[in-house]
Amino acid sequence: MAYLEVRGVEKSYTTSAGATCVLGGIDLALDEGEFVAVVGYSGSGKTTLVSLIGGLIPPDAGSIVLDGAPVSEPGPERGMVFQQYSLLPWLSVYDNVALAVDAVNPGLSGAERRRVTEEFIALVNLSEATWKRPRELSGGMRQRVAVARGLAMRPKLLLMDEPFSALDALTRATLQDELLRIWGERRSTVIMVTNDVDEAILLADRIYPMTPGPGAVLGPAIEVGLERPRHRRHMSLTPAYQKARQGIVEFLRACRRGWA
């Protein structure tokens, strides 16, 4: 059995205009330590998929199993990083991260709590901003806090919902490189959804393109045959990059034209 198994998951929403099928039967499997990306157009259902795996909403059909346990509600074994920073504005960087530490380690001594909290703040290179509040931070720094908070729960699975899409291009590239470094050190199991093909190729081991919907499904898996550690400067010149990018782009364009 895979570490994460998503089988036949469907989800519809009902509005005054009637029912809309968002996901029409999602199948997905991850091994422990894998970094998988789901790529699709805006509005295709990527956030709905993350919310289902995170236990924030229930599926209409199908099952989600993580490490042998069914997913039916939110839990500390699944960390989440959203597009919006979702930080508590009245708390410092330290206190925002410490909340996550407390959630999974309520019995820690004060010294151990401080050590663990500072460890994850240092992991995202924010030690100098430890006592600053979110309003004193740039957008990129706020998102680093969100990543630190997600990792501080030591989750079995980290879910990332377009975490860098609200950032400017330079900050986005910096945080992508930071995430590469952190993943290389921690080897966490990660699912990231994004509409940026190059971001997915840079970060992921395997990529699933998603059809536009309604009734979105995942297309065939595309393996990213790039060695790690990866360097964006040379990546675009490699045959593996060009093959992966061509496969994703052609699938998504064909879906838009109604050919897939």
Task: Report residues per predicted region.
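Short coil-to-helix segment of the ABC ATPase nucleotide-binding domain corresponding to the Q-loop/switch region
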Residues: 91-100
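The feature captures the beta-strand-to-loop junction immediately N-terminal to the Walker
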Residues: 39-41
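Conserved signature/switch motifs of ABC ATPase nucleotide-binding domains
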Residues: 132-135, 153
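Hydrophobic anchor residue at the start of the ABC signature
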Residues: 147
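Conserved ABC ATPase "signature" region
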Residues: 105, 109-129, 181
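Catalytic Walker B motif of ABC-type/P-loop ATPase nucleotide-binding domains
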Residues: 158-161
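Helix-to-loop junction immediately C-terminal to a conserved catalytic motif
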Residues: 54
